[in-house]
Amino acid sequence: MADSQSGSNVFSLRIVSIDYYMASPIPGYNICYSSFQGSEVNEVPVIRIYGSTPAGQKTCLHIHRALPYLYIPCSEIPLEHHKGVDGSTLALSLELEKALKLKGNAASKRQHIHDCEIVRAKKFYGYHSTEEAFVKIYLSYHPPDVARAASLLLAGAVLGKSLQPYESHIPFILQFLVDYNLYGMGHVHISKMKFRSPVPHHFRPRRFDLDDCPGQRIDEVAITKANSSAAASVSFPVWSLSTIPGQWMWNLSEESDTPLSQSQHRHQHHYRRQSLCELEGDATSSDILNQQFKMYNSLSQAQSDTNMVQSLVAIWEEEYERTGVHDAPIPPDPGKPSAADVLQTMSDYVGFGNMLKEMLNKVELSPPGMKPTAVSSAGPDMHAKPEITDLQALNHMVGTCSEFPASEQLSPLGEKSEEASMENDEYMKTPTDRDTPAQIQDAEALGLFKWFASSQAAEDINSDDEILRETILSPLLPLASINKVLEMASTDYVSQSQKECQDILDSQENLPDFGSSTKRALPSNPDSQNLRTSSDKQSLEIEVASDVPDSSTSNGASENSFRRYRKSDLHTSEVMEYKNRSFSKSNKPSNSVWGPLPFTLTKNLQKDFDSTNASDKLGLTKISSYPMNEMTDNYIVPVKEHQADVCNTIDRNVLAGCSLRDLMRKKRLCHGESPVSQHMKSRKVRDSRHGEKNECTLRCEAKKQGPALSAEFSEFVCGDTPNLSPIDSGNCECNISTESSELHSVDRCSAKETASQNSDEVLRNLSSTTVPFGKDPQTVESGTLVSSNIHVGIEIDSVQKSGREQESTANETDETGRLICLTLSKKPPSLDCLSAGLQDSAHSHEIHAREKQHDEYEGNSNDIPFFPLEDNKEEKKHFFQGTSLGIPLHHLNDGSNLYLLTPAFSPPSVDSVLQWISNDKGDSNIDSEKQPLRDNHNDRGASFTDLASASNVVSVSEHVEQHNNLFVNSESNAYTESEIDLKPKGTFLNLNLQASVSQELSQISGPDGKSGPTPLSQMGFRDPASMGAGQQLTILSIEVHAESRGDLRPDPRFDSVNVIALVVQNDDSFVAEVFVLLFSPDSIDQRNVDGLSGCKLSVFLEERQLFRYFIETLCKWDPDVLLGWDIQGGSIGFLAERAAQLGIRFLNNISRTPSPTTTNNSDNKRKLGNNLLPDPLVANPAQVEEVVIEDEWGRTHASGVHVGGRIVLNAWRLIRGEVKLNMYTIEAVSEAVLRQKVPSIPYKVLTEWFSSGPAGARYRCIEYVIRRANLNLEIMSQLDMINRTSELARVFGIDFFSVLSRGSQYRVESMLLRLAHTQNYLAISPGNQQVASQPAMECVPLVMEPESAFYDDPVIVLDFQSLYPSMIIAYNLCFSTCLGKLAHLKMNTLGVSSYSLDLDVLQDLNQILQTPNSVMYVPPEVRRGILPRLLEEILSTRIMVKKAMKKLTPSEAVLHRIFNARQLALKLIANVTYGYTAAGFSGRMPCAELADSIVQCGRSTLEKAISFVNANDNWNARVVYGDTDSMFVLLKGRTVKEAFVVGQEIASAITEMNPHPVTLKMEKVYHPCFLLTKKRYVGYSYESPNQREPIFDAKGIETVRRDTCEAVAKTMEQSLRLFFEQKNISKVKSYLYRQWKRILSGRVSLQDFIFAKEVRLGTYSTRDSSLLPPAAIVATKSMKADPRTEPRYAERVPYVVIHGEPGARLVDMVVDPLVLLDVDTPYRLNDLYYINKQIIPALQRVFGLVGADLNQWFLEMPRLTRSSLGQRPLNSKNSHKTRIDYFYLSKHCILCGEVVQESAQLCNRCLQNKSAAAATIVWKTSKLEREMQHLATICRHCGGGDWVVQSGVKCNSLACSVFYERRKVQKELRGLSSIATESELYPKCMAEWF
């Protein structure tokens, strides 16, 4: 085997599905012995992760050594058991073990407790100033034991006292994800693992086929995929027998020649494969690298722009990659009042102060023994250390730093903001670590960090200084070594402190040489051979970052020390990064920050730099290309080390007089200085003695050398310089400065003063002239991250220097340090300059397709070399946002900045140039404007998703605009390579015609000509994880057709499966493969005799053979997601039920981990021949469904079908939460989502089609099933369910299926615990009794009863943005900051738990915030809450997303929809955070006091705003309604525009009254409107003063509700529109008269009168069936005829109300709509019920406010009743005999309705004019026949017609309006044509044919 995979030793796997199982431990690999039990371990939990590697290899990963646990406070253990650490923990554990055994099976030998230890942490529930000791008990072996143990502890079954458990309510899987920093749909990175045999010999790309032919063999070590987001090709490792390291394989393969030991033989079964995945392996929890990169910064020190919630950083980076601009959070307004001041106006602070003083006085006067004190943190003999995340965490915190280059260990040096620099000039002169080089700072920070780790536990453990306590949840050292460790820590503390002080003093002297500093700061590099390889290939990379200290680096524990990567950094090249142990800055987007520097290395480089210690001589940092330029390679700037003098501004006498501790504090303060992110302010540190600035200059001079471009360094100031590749740079001068890293501006708005044309050319050609086009980017990137990455900052310095400052000599250069800054000699233009340049006219100098296109931009390109000029002014405005002086600026989360320097235009590829030249041979005078050259970078996946908006295809868009403004739909080109468009203009017509044809077929209204066509499918969007390479998900859609008997639905007990349609698709592909498995026992020919196209067909003679083949095929494809519309009834559920009848273990066989009895480990294939099939599993057929549906919750809320390792999605139930519809049939959803009409064919017809054979209509049945399988994928893609759910999984940190199946508390808890654990908090786990017995919640939100009326004056709607989250942030409301109520403090309770507060904390009233409900909290200056910080980041992310939405163009409708979904998800998680605190019934950690505080603060804020508005005479406004977070303000006598002005004033004034971030926003203006009752209002809304057409906006009324029918909603909306526009109630009355007459005469569509309501059978009372809801009654009636028609839980069942007997109840008058639509139906729609009980009451609630009486209107209306069905001619008699007209002897005239004799058809009056009567009958019959034929044609075109024309249309879709019209016309035609035929006036017309 290969020793390594391209040097990589990291295995990465995407977490798609995760579960755990119990197994016996693997010797030497798992926990095999328990010291607590004193015996071997029998079973341990093993976590199983399913997913794909970045290369797409399906993998099953077993994680060992992860155990469930819980915590118990040591303070709650009874005192008699305090016999030291060992005694107390042992007694507790033994008692708990005994209780668990007694609770279970006493005779069982099952083990429960594995180990216990003492840890130290803070309680999260309530304010606790000190840490406490906890017993951490590992309940090994069975995770459900944790819940049982918690119940026993709370019940007092252990030690005879109720003990409060902590974190026992967290599920085992979530506990694992949180502890090891893992996220669903993110990657887990493993440092080492063991693969289980067999492994694939070669990598074969996954392909979907039904044969056994092997795929194409690929021998490469890595596969390359195009990444369209980074526009670069990314190489992913492939794991096969030839690439897996030998030590990474279990030595148990049959192919191995190594003899096995006896132990290995005995445990050989442990290493056998369990899964069917391509790869399978084992790893331990300690091998997970993700856990090492948590960020442990204290919240009190983290800046607002530092993302502590790591899952949100990816959203910020994606936006930066898309726009190139980093949108920093908006800082709070310093002029706004403080939280304490606002709370004083809400609360009775005088009474509160008196009560508090009285209580404190009583405490002081009480006897010493009675004085309440804080709960002791530990017993007298207990010694504990701060807890960290695992046993080696202390080593991780220090040791891991030594594994990586020093430049990656220490924090990136941030930059001070302009404001901060101006406000505090002295800070610029303060002696800080900015004056020292990075290597000295590295050593200082590392030493300081070691001092914290060693000394803090012994000395500062009880301090409340959050700067000192950064250590996080971890087990402690054994007791025997505690004293020794403390002694060593004390010694280390003294030595480290002395070394720190010496370093501080040394920093004021001359810097040591580079070699010595390197040896001290950098560890030995184990990968030096990789460095040598990279230097040989001349592909060393350098990485640029800022060099200014950041606030997050306080305590020396820099952010970069912990967070070396994130998933977004690793998703393209994570293996390469891990391989070299060089992790990029956490907040720096990978491959998208820097443009290439114009330098290359030649072979002479090796002469000056030895490859073995190149890292000691070169400061090299990686530079990645900007997305538009990533096809270029990376460049190196070699700089030799020289010594430099550093400013010495510290008085040595002052330093000498400081104590050791003072020096350390000074050191910490220097690190923790409040650095705000700096935009573009220069920071030049000058020598205080000489006032000079040390600066080194790197000057490049370019010379023309014939036609070729060349350049050379004419002056290289660093002495020995390698020969560099020549570069044409004109007069480009690059200043390299040590201290200056700012952009200086000197106005140069004249084009003549800017860079010359040659220098402009250089800037454009930097990325194309130094590296050949054909160079393999993979070669350049391989092995380059090994080098020591020294962060340098790039500066654009164009200050016009004079004298010594402008001249840079070699002597000055020799004194500079190793940290350098690259500076361009010519500054970019300012914004003013750019604006002026945009107005200049274009001047063409030469034919240059990338440079001179007047259609692309205006102005002189030499004026602005950094940016292309666009015509779109709006785009220019957006492009310059967040930039300073024209340079894109990226604000990192740590406060530092990155400057984005890219060429103005990306160069074309070689193929593009060659094709351009070849096409240009015919005409040498082609105008470049008419022949635009498009980029064709195949190697970087460049593409343009919108050709109409692409500036370099203007000739196309201009021509298209001339033809009906139709734009070119380029969605098909979005993921293909671009082409050069050099066709003559005549060809554009064809392109235009194709676009118009595609729009006609899209069934979507065409664009208005102002924007491109909106893509119909969401497949045009891919989220960051699936960009280019995809998320490696395989989705399989399954639909089934089975036989049916008569009108019954298929029953798996009796009916065989005939057709299985399989549609499989990878998420990175737009092409779905279709396969059909056909059971046809009569088929002799196995060929595709049905003539099906676009699919692969397999025919089977036996049903068992069909199932066997289906199982084999599914296991070969190994899909991640199984999808079906109705899983339980028509997809996998039906197959499982049928397989159970056949004796096949279907669900077990299709799982990824089947039972060993059905898996052949030798070839990993299923062997399910008929001889291996066991007897039927179910003896009683009635129990079949119970076998398939495993749990009740799954049946009612998900699919109910569980397949191990695969996600089963019930499509209709997912859509139910996405789209609001009356019915959720696939036909209704397809029309609403896809705008496609889909036929609904009854099972009886499908069976007839299939039975007709290949010569008949069997193909119609097969196509119908295939279409439904395809629709599943299309609907999911249209709604982007897979990608959106994946994104939510990454944000929430939970697995994919939990996003869909778990509630909001689970989501909040995942995000909350991750942040809480970084601050050393433990969450309480209350029991059900505790939750029920907590104090009742007293506060309710303010919901005013509105002044119900019609308002003809403007009504302003003002809304507090995210009111409850804003309250939490503004007033620091959190579990960890809550001090409780004074009244409750006497009872020592807080929420669900007991709480004793140290009253010394209450001494200072200024340090306490009291909310209006008298609950006390500490201000953020004392402690920053977890909830406020979490919500602050969520809201800032949402604001950023909403801003991005506003900047999108109309053609980016798909992206707009995704952004909208993203911001709604963030809004949801922010709003439900309050619900997490207030979940009083099923809450996992509720707190009544906290919930009441949030509600009452919000209520008080709203009440205060209402009073303020009503009391302000200037506005003359009055609040007429208020609801939780909004208020409606009436402005009498104002116009809409005036209302907007007043509304903005109100919003601004109230916003200024409240602390940050409470914001009142003006939403809209209603004019006019109705206010009905609470939460019910409707009106015409205006969202801007310039809006002309109002929007009909309603809430809570029938127009938006689904508990009524469409007739009510349509009638009400039209009536309201008439009244709003006409202001005349008579118009409404006339309209209603017309509608009522239509209803009474029957001239309506039945579709508008269908009710559809949810049915939950099994939840209703069984005492009286008449008490069931109408929909349930209809369902039960249907089930009596066919039990398989049982509706799914919460399925919406349609019904209509018909006429019944006199006095009949409503439950007796409801029927299925299909019953009423039947041609021979005896029923008639109950028109009076709909008018009197539905339409009139709804409208009366509205128009009653203006004095209308609709009941009186209806009574006064001339009553026109239609003739009964008995008076209408029918072809057949009333066979049902359910009406009295069956017994009538008389009939009615078919023309006038008069009574006639039984044998006559016409009355005497009509017979007097026979010709007129005959003409009338013929005309009516002909008209109906034409209508019927037209409707039937529509239905046949849709696919609803029968294969025999005479059989008519078989579709009966209730979602189709054509179906209702067709049935209505069919009834009329049937009766009239029979009479016309009998009268011999018209030929016979068969209505059944239609």
From Swiss-Prot:
Which UniProt keywords are given for this protein, alphabetically ordered?
A: 4Fe-4S, DNA damage, DNA repair, DNA replication, DNA-binding, DNA-directed DNA polymerase, Iron, Iron-sulfur, Metal-binding, Nucleotidyltransferase, Nucleus, Transferase, Zinc, Zinc-finger
Q: Where in the cell is it found?
A: Nucleus
Q: What is its EC number?
A: 2.7.7.7
The note on cofactor binding and number reads: Binds 1 [4Fe-4S] cluster.
What are the disulphide bonds in this sequence? none
Q: Where is the composition biased (Polar residues)?
A: 508-533, 549-560
Which parts of the sequence are CysA-type zinc fingers?
1789-1806
Q: Where is this region: Disordered?
A: 508-565, 922-942
Classification via CDD domains: DNA_polB_zeta_exo, POLBc_zeta
Could you identify this protein by its name? DNA polymerase zeta catalytic subunit
Q: Which organism's genome codes for this protein?
A: Arabidopsis thaliana
